[in-house]
Amino acid sequence: MKYFLILLFLNMIFTKNYNLSELINIALEKSPQIKLANEDKKISLSHSIEARSAALPRIQFVTSATRNYNVAGQPIDFPIPFGVLNPVTGDPIPTEWNPGLQETEIIPYETMFSMGRDYSGLYGININQTIFDGRVFAGIRASNKFKNLTNASYDSQKEEIIENTKISFYTVLLTKKVTEVFHKSLKRSKDNLFNTKLLYDSGKTNELELIRAESMVKDQETTYSNAKKNEILALEKLKLTIGFNLSQNLNIVGAFKDSIQIIPEFNEISNQLLAQQPRIKQLEANHDLLQEDVNSYLSEFLPSIELTGSIHKFQSQNKDNFTWKNFQDNSSLSINIGLPLFNGFGSTARIMRAKANAKKAYYHSEDLKNNLLLDLRNIHLSLIEANEKINAGNKKLELASRGYNIANDLFLTGMTTQLELLGAEVSLNRAELNLLQAKYEFQIALVKLSRAIGKNTTGNTK
């Protein structure tokens, strides 16, 4: 038990405090979404390499060896010249006018002729090079578009992770501030109970006021306990968001920003959205990729040209003559040209389908732009509203604080009741909470604005 307490104490001492930037770095390193996005980038790179490889020469080493155990004969008719042999008896047949010649005409004589040797061998290199193929070049262009699509998707995931991390961070910060508000309220309630007991003991107030003071303390204890619970849950949610170990302690440091003097104009941020928003880039890249599908199908009507070459060494010999020195050069070079003439309108149908898909992607992209601009308008108005709430909240908090001090002084002098002091306490708590809520809304609006205009990934070319 002693060692456990020592370890717990050391853990509390050496627990690191994390600011927002450090938490974002942790999220971008450990978040499952970013890991998936990184694997998608690797897949995109593999597609690019694969597409370009189709335009590179293909070089292959080949070798073969054959041992013929039985060589089949080929029947061939050989003619017997005049005056040589009788095809039946094999004896010479003289003529009347010349004993050295045959009487008959040329007579074919069938014999079996074996065309082959005991051993044959070949080794060498085959080379194939695409000179022109529209589908190959369309594939290379498509791989570049796919790379742009993957990068935009990665940036979109990154924007979402950063936004979720910031929202979780400021939610924890809000719950910590709320806990502080109710802790101060509980302390004021306890001080009020102490003063009320003194007044009651001196006969300056009645028992009902004492009961109200005790009830106020119990109410504030319950509220404070609930606030601490919400703070713990918000912190656990932050750990899950950034991929932090739930068993480790996590302390955050930071503060809400006060209202800013100048809020950017809507036209300015709308232009930034259209130029930088990863989701728009993602759909535009998808449209470009589908447009390359159209080009790929159009290339089916174009000719293809391929160059083929071979550099071989070959020999075919019987066993005694099969040696390295008998290998002979056997090289060739050829060019192959293919020109499509008719394929049953299949290519035409594929082109129609590809064009329709490309148009759908374009319409989807335009619709997304309009929706994002509408969301941006909402964010911009929320930013203005939250800014005004902060300015008003600061004034209300100042008035509520003065009101509570006045009510407390009047109660101590017996000039007011516990109910009026309780009302002042509630007003002070409400003013503090409303100001915190306004600051939180302002901060969240800034977070959403950053994601809307793609601020977190601006200039990212990875």
Annotated model-derived regions:
Residues 36-51, 157, 161-180, 198, ...:
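Amphipathic alpha-helical coiled-coil segments
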Residues 62-125, 253-263, 295, 308-339, ...:
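Small/polar, glycine/serine/threonine/aspartate-rich low-complexity segments that form flexible
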Residues 35, 59-73, 111-118, 128-156, ...:
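Small/polar (Gly/Ser/Thr/Ala-rich) solvent-exposed segments
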Residues 3-12:
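Sec-dependent N-terminal signal peptides
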Residues 22, 46, 152-272, 382, ...:
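Periplasmic alpha-helical coiled-coil/stalk elements that build and connect Gram-negative outer-membrane
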Residues 124-126, 169, 270, 334-336, ...:
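Membrane-embedded beta-strand positions in outer-membrane beta-barrel channels/transporters
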Residues 14-73, 246-288, 340-341, 369, ...:
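Bacterial Sec-pathway N-terminal export signals of envelope proteins
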